[in-house]
Amino acid sequence: MELENIVANTVLLKAREGGGGKRKGKSKKWKEILKFPHISQCEDLRRTIDRDYCSLCDKQPIGRLLFRQFCETRPGLECYIQFLDSVAEYEVTPDEKLGEKGKEIMTKYLTPKSPVFIAQVGQDLVSQTEEKLLQKPCKELFSACAQSVHEYLRGEPFHEYLDSMFFDRFLQWKWLERQPVTKNTFRQYRVLGKGGFGEVCACQVRATGKMYACKRLEKKRIKKRKGESMALNEKQILEKVNSQFVVNLAYAYETKDALCLVLTIMNGGDLKFHIYNMGNPGFEEERALFYAAEILCGLEDLHRENTVYRDLKPENILLDDYGHIRISDLGLAVKIPEGDLIRGRVGTVGYMAPEVLNNQRYGLSPDYWGLGCLIYEMIEGQSPFRGRKEKVKREEVDRRVLETEEVYSHKFSEEAKSICKMLLTKDAKQRLGCQEEGAAEVKRHPFFRNMNFKRLEAGMLDPPFVPDPRAVYCKDVLDIEQFSTVKGVNLDHTDDDFYSKFSTGSVSIPWQNEMIETECFKELNVFGPNGTLPPDLNRNHPPEPPKKGLLQRLFKRQHQNNSKSSPSSKTSFNHHINSNHVSSNSTGSS
């Protein structure tokens, strides 16, 4: 029993480390798997792709890199990219150095005598920016100037890009991105835990070596529990939210028995484990503050999509290899219709907000209550309305949430106590974060006085704790309870519409990030000498014929060897080849 767990963990750790070889977990055939199609095969994509500058040149990571490469080959455009890079650097500069960095940008790019002067930024805007810089520099100082540059780039430069080999290469990447995804796209490793409809296991993309967590939703279990809308809702929300503080959906596919969500793998365990199983319960305030800030950023990204999470609790906050956190398990999240409120008594006992317990209509307010519960628990080492391991009925916990005030020990600083009280205000209308400004209001609380959120969002701040890379922060394989077999449920063609909505393959932004992070983009994104067209982008160069299979090569060789034979034997042999060829094709298509 113990041996099985050791073997499973050893295999997983080796996969996480890249297998110990130069390929870093990639298949021997990874270049074959990611071989570009000839550009002639991308014409349908060219006709149908949405030609939106923001999407193609900014939001999509590979699109952004290729547009930059295009600009760097055009005299006069390179300085615009350099200016945008400088503005991005300015926004993550420490507050005390903003003035100095701002002056550098003004002098280099917004002064007429400069060799890289950005003429497209109007003089009135330059004067306003300079005045604000002299008064008090802020993070958003150059936002309007950057917007002005983007407005210029989305014009003639963007249209030139669409006719360039760089956009053709982007179409090749999109063609690869849209290839079918199946269970054979991945290697499967040990079970990490259980979800509502099935197991969660570690997996690895064969082509890139990137590790993910695969959440299996058993088809029969979904159908028995009538969970189709819940499963599809989670998938669609994950697909739309692109946040470094929320687990990302990279792939969605189906097998004969299950629907599979391939998600960011978080190897560092959950906050519940770290609060209660690593020394004395709770964290030092500095560590609690860091996690609270990242959770707040994740909520802000969800709320930007008008999505309320509704299930904030320590076990749903996961740590990655480096100690950063992400919000996971969006099964109870729901998108709120524009200008509307929703109702629903869902969540976890002890963490549900008063308005949820009272079955009142609400918007995003339950998430700020949940944040208050989390900050309290991280510092105190127990939840605000229930003692650690306290045996108490659900009704009593609900009563405490509605009627009693939480108790604060010596562990809380005045700022920590203040933010918890303001987030745990029972009247949602008076709660911190529930006004028009939302997360921005919470960020201004004195508890976060020393937190530079721009640098945090850019991944430039070191976490207070880094998980052990040689540890597997989950239960032993045999301690994870297995699901029972679902009986009395049959799958039929009426389920196919739901499966087709779910199994949509790769998700653009995570897939493109995977190509960049695993250096597949760097290795494959090669053009001809001195910027010339490579054969796969040359319309006058016919595409390479597909490689022949082993059987075809053997038959060809045998045919050549027998070409000197008598006509009768040759006819007989050809008949034999044709028979085998038909048989082989039949087998291959099954």
From Swiss-Prot:
Its main location: cytoplasm. A motif (Nuclear localization signal) lies at residues 388-395. Changing R388A: Nuclear exclusion. It is found in: Cytoplasm; Nucleus; Cell membrane. It comes from the Eukaryota. GO terms for cellular component: cytoplasm; cytosol; nuclear membrane; nuclear speck; plasma membrane. Residues 546-565 are annotated as: Sufficient for membrane localization. Inhibited by calmodulin with an IC(50) of 50 nM. Calmodulin inhibits GRK5 association with receptor and phospholipid. Residues 53-171 form the RGS domain. Changing K389A: Nuclear exclusion. Residues 20-39 are annotated as: Interaction with calmodulin. Residues 531-590 are annotated as: Disordered. Highest levels in heart, placenta, lung > skeletal muscle > brain, liver, pancreas > kidney. Autophosphorylated. Autophosphorylation may play a critical role in the regulation of GRK5 kinase activity. Keywords: Apoptosis, ATP-binding, Cell membrane, Cytoplasm, Kinase, Lipid-binding, Membrane, Nucleotide-binding, Nucleus, Phosphoprotein, Serine/threonine-protein kinase, Transferase, Wnt signaling pathway. The active site is at D311 (proton acceptor). Its EC number is 2.7.11.16. Pfam families: Pkinase, RGS. GO terms for molecular function: ATP binding; beta-adrenergic receptor kinase activity; G protein-coupled receptor kinase activity; phospholipid binding; protein kinase activity; protein kinase C binding; protein serine/threonine kinase activity. Residues 186-448 form the Protein kinase domain. It catalyses: [G-protein-coupled receptor] + ATP = [G-protein-coupled receptor]-phosphate + ADP + H(+). Interacts with ST13 (via the C-terminus 303-319 AA). Interacts with TP53/p53. Interacts with HTR4 (via C-terminus 330-346 AA); this interaction is promoted by 5-HT (serotonin). Interacts with HDAC5. Interacts with GIT1. Belongs to the protein kinase superfamily. AGC Ser/Thr protein kinase family. GPRK subfamily. Serine/threonine kinase that phosphorylates preferentially the activated forms of a variety of G-protein-coupled receptors (GPCRs). Such receptor phosphorylation initiates beta-arrestin-mediated receptor desensitization, internalization, and signaling events leading to their down-regulation. Phosphorylates a variety of GPCRs, including adrenergic receptors, muscarinic acetylcholine receptors (more specifically Gi-coupled M2/M4 subtypes), dopamine receptors and opioid receptors. This is G protein-coupled receptor kinase 5. It comes from Homo sapiens (Human). The gene is GRK5.
